[in-house]
Design a protein with these regions (language model features):
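Domain-level representation of secreted and single-pass membrane ectodomains enriched
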Residues: 1-176
Length: 176
């Protein structure tokens, strides 16, 4: 998919002047699935991890949107940038126990690596990436580490704050 970041910024500036919300990323439709994308890597101890490397040249950050996100109990998923200066996770079964659609926080840079560590049970995960958000503008709005730590009760704009009405379905998980 080809597009001009400068053209996007020009259109965004006009949209914001008309009262539209700030746009920080362009969604790029994709189809990556743990079942048929990425590589399984054997480690010296005999265990295996799955890795998927995604790159979108020139992006400030990448955001992943999943059509299905299920991590079996005992398994872990990590996301990190190429320099490993930002590591997200471990995402576990407790992160999103109902499975289904999900989005992960923005990862700085134009590359993201997903690394899945399987559960001892061998249960199959479901990781289906349907879109990559190509972050191109207003980095401070999508990268919390650029801002002062917000404190308890805070959630990103696209996340549900479990202390609010929208978080009613997450009260069991809130208790830990």
């Amino acid at each position: 998919m080809n597009f001009s970041v400068e053209d996007l910024k020009t259109v965004d500036a006009w949209r914001v002047s008309q009262g539209a919300p700030l746009r920080v990323a362009k969604s790029i439709p994709t189809s990556f699935d743990i079942a048929d994308s990425g590589d399984w890597i054997s480690l010296p101890d005999g265990s295996q991890v799955w890795q998927l490397h995604l790159q979108a040249k020139g992006a400030i950050a990448l955001i992943l949107y999943y059509s299905d996100f299920y991590i079996p109990k005992g398994a872990r998923l990590y996301l990190y940038n190429a320099a490993k200066t930002q590591v997200l996770g471990a995402y576990t079964h407790r992160t999103h126990p109902k499975n289904g659609p999900f989005a992960t926080q923005a990862v700085a840079g134009d590359e993201v690596i997903l690394e899945y560590v399987p559960a001892p049970s061998g249960e199959t995960p479901r990781l289906r990436i349907r879109e990559v958000g190509y972050g191109y503008n207003h980095l401070e709005a999508i990268m919390p580490e650029v801002q002062e730590a917000p404190g308890a009760g805070y959630s990103e704009a696209c996340e549900v704050n479990i202390n609010c009405e929208e978080g009613t379905d997450w009260q069991e998980q809130k208790k830990g």
